[in-house]
Amino acid sequence: MKNGESSIIKFNQKTLKFVLIIYLVSCIASLINAITMKVTGINDYVTTSAIVILTAAIVIYGIVFRICYVWTVGKNEFNMKAFNATKGVILFITYFHYILLDVILHSDSQWMIIFYFIILGALFFDLKMVSISMVL
């Protein structure tokens, strides 16, 4: 890091890995929830193929997050262009995962989880990203 970097950039560099890991853990928790619903018979709409699709999506998220992280903080220098792209990727994955869960689980209470992901996105202190999240 250079001496002239702002405190927000330093904060974003330190929290990026944390936020990406929390996003991935949250997606894995949703997979565990879907599997539990299928095994216990709580939700009859959850199929084995849906579980496989959800698992594949989460593996892809992990790969994409890893690529974004390496691209953003690689070479011991914070790449702002890559960071902005990573925020866009996070926003896309947030809504894609929400829609995927909505299709798989057929639950009326799924809308509540979107606020959790918006709050995680707010850790980047990016008003534009949070505003877009709320509008979508």
Question: Which positions does each model-derived feature cover?
Answer:
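Short, Lys/Arg-rich, polar N-terminal cytosolic tail immediately upstream
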Residues: 1-12
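Glycan-recognition and catalytic regions of carbohydrate-active enzymes
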Residues: 15
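Select subsegments of transmembrane alpha-helices in polytopic membrane proteins
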Residues: 18-25
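Hydrophobic transmembrane alpha-helices and their membrane-interface boundaries in multi-pass
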Residues: 27-106, 113-119
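Short helix-perturbing small/polar motifs within transmembrane alpha-helices
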Residues: 118-129
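Central hydrophobic cores of alpha-helical transmembrane segments
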Residues: 129-136
